[in-house]
Amino acid sequence: MTTILGLTCISEQLKDKDKKKYSFRTMTRKRFNDLCVRDGRDEAIKELSERIAHNLYVTQYILRHCHSNDIRHYRLSSSLFPLLTDQTLELAYTDLPNHKRLDTELRFIGIIAKTFGISLGSHPDQFVVLASANKNAVKNSINELNFHASIFEKIGLPQDHTAPMNIHVNRSIKDGETLEDIAEIFYSNLMKCNAGVRSRLTIENEDKLSLFNIDDCIKFSEYLFETHNYNLPVCADNLHHLCNPSEVLNFAWQAERCAYTWVNQGEGEHNFIAPVFHWSEGKPEKPRAHADYIAFGNFPPYIAIDPDKPAKWEVEVKAKCKAVKLLQEQMAGAI
């Protein structure tokens, strides 16, 4: 498979030029509530809306930077819209005084990405747990996913896995449970999500030993397809595989198995969807934590599928686009 390198969320190169201009801005619940007390709720919402507008401008800058550096996939930051899915605050997108302007900026993000041939995806909050036994956790998860999908619609992204929304199953198999039991809970709650979620959702293997490894994810995906005719592609993460290995340790072989779950829109060559995978390395002293850069020798893994078919690799290291640039140079030198 050919290799497409992807950037995740932040551009360290842009931040080196102007940290304030190119950094995403967030807002904590405490900060919002303090503003409400000091200046009133309307003023607090106004400040929040301006921070969100800034985040959309930063995203546009990053997409242009991706184009200039031949990066053809980008994972949108999950922090673009702070607090809007915090149900305790009772905030809605349309409460933002500049929401129509934000609609325009989101459409422009889509235009930039389409013009430059950059695919987009996301990785919603790690606390999204569709298979949870906690009803409130499920409610919050559905709300989070539906919101992400609504933003994808405003951007103008296709309702398929070329614009993946990637999550973890985030459940261990407890005594008396089976993987199939968890799959049924997951599927039942997924069907409560809107069509934009259902058509884009993917899952990835996890880094904790008690949670889903690649084998579990593939079995999970196969069960949903065979039982409900629902396709759930699997994103392979190499660092998570090292921390929480499957029976077969060879990651390239496991990634190949995952790649076949992305052929999901019917029969025929034209229905192949390029898989989106994750590549990272851990710190020697803390293996589950992302290192700054990637050692080129192990990347990209050889996946024995048609060499003309692409695989997208979101590079998950602290140096972000600096690491992508270095990988590009190393790969070019190896040809």
Model-inferred region functions:
Residues 139, 145-234, 239:
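Eukaryote-skewed repeat-based solenoidal scaffolds used as protein-protein interaction platforms
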Residues 130-131, 174-177, 243-246:
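A generic structural signal for short coil/turn motifs at secondary-structure boundaries
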Residues 208, 235, 239-243, 276-282:
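Positively charged, amphipathic and often flexible ligand-engagement surfaces
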Residues 77-81, 124-125, 170, 205-206:
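Short, well-ordered beta-to-alpha junction loops that form the rim of enzyme active sites
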Residues 1-119, 128-157, 161, 182, ...:
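Alpha/beta catalytic barrel-like cores
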Residues 120-128, 233-243:
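Histidine-centered catalytic micro-motifs
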